[in-house]
Amino acid sequence: MTTLETGAGTDSVKISKLGQIGVAVADLEAMTTFYRDHLGVPFLFAAPGMSFFDLGGVRLMLSLPERGSEARHASILYLDVPDIAAAHAALVGRGVPFDGVPHAVHRYPGGELWMAFFRDPEGNMLALMSDVKV
């Protein structure tokens, strides 16, 4: 748990977990369809200009950009899966184009961190990630 202290050091705010990730999109309907139907992310609800999904207890908010700004492709969503090879094959079968195949990006005692990168229809980078025991 992280503690963020005020300048005076007398009050603190305890940040216990990530609650929501926001991604600005240009075509909300198309992106809602992609995340819900192609990736299979559970859809929670929609509000004017926004769609919300559940990523294992962390909410994903797709939203139209604020007035005067545009959608940016800066953040990467890392989607944790138990079997990266199976998840990759399933998404390829649904027509999701990947930038490459799943591969190890880091080795640590007893395992490896594997990733596979792809983009949504608006060019936002996403990745599958999985800790693989060796």
What is each of the regions a protein language model found here?
Residues M1-E29, R59, S75-L77, M129-V134:
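N-terminal beta-strand motif that seeds the catalytic metal site of vicinal oxygen chelate
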Residues S16, G22-L60, E66:
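Core segments of cupin and vicinal oxygen chelate
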Residues L28, L77-M125:
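Vicinal oxygen chelate
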Residues P48, L55-G57, A71-A74, G93:
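Short connector loops at helix/strand junctions that flank enzyme active sites
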Residues M50, P65, H103-R107:
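Short, solvent-exposed loop/turn elements at beta->coil junctions and helix N-caps
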Residues F53-G57, F118-P121, D131:
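Active-site beta-strand termini and strand-to-loop segments that position acidic
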Residues R59-M61, S69-E70, N124:
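Short, charged/polar, Gly/Pro-enriched secondary-structure boundary elements
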